[in-house]
């Protein structure tokens, strides 16, 4: 944490094909070792697969999937009197989308299809329908928060 001033947020440029900032952020999340062109190819390939499979606008599917996967609450560990409690806290909007993107990436990685573009396309389609690995992760996080609701008075 800086002592002098608040560090400004970096502005992310929208992606070249769709002009969407969320898609550009997702590409940055997917990117490994600074290879943005590879991440771009994966995302656009996944969007092509979505267009062929669902006959819908890929951006629409992407935003629906993101909306479905975004968590509302999560748990944070808090130490009180020698015991650790999992305290449910609300997730701020920027972290919501960051978590959703990470979960989509991880769920896509674990899938069995041949190419990453296919895996990502299928994961996005499933997430848009409310199923899949990323949705499972979200439900798990929500379940944890629900189970530890009794400790919500230990606010941060």
UniProtKB/Swiss-Prot annotation:
A molecular function (GO) term: rRNA binding
UniProt record similarity statement: Belongs to the universal ribosomal protein uS7 family.
Keyword field: Ribonucleoprotein, Ribosomal protein, RNA-binding, rRNA-binding, tRNA-binding
Pfam families in alphabetical order: Ribosomal_S7
Domain of life: Bacteria
Quaternary structure note: Part of the 30S ribosomal subunit. Contacts proteins S9 and S11.
SUPFAM superfamilies linked: Ribosomal protein S7
Keyword Ribosomal protein: yes
Any one Gene Ontology BP term: translation
Function noted in UniProt: One of the primary rRNA binding proteins, it binds directly to 16S rRNA where it nucleates assembly of the head domain of the 30S subunit. Is located at the subunit interface close to the decoding center, probably blocks exit of the E-site tRNA.
Record PANTHER family: RIBOSOMAL PROTEIN S7
Provenance organism: Polynucleobacter necessarius subsp. necessarius (strain STIR1)
One GO cellular component term: small ribosomal subunit
The name this protein goes by in its record: Small ribosomal subunit protein uS7
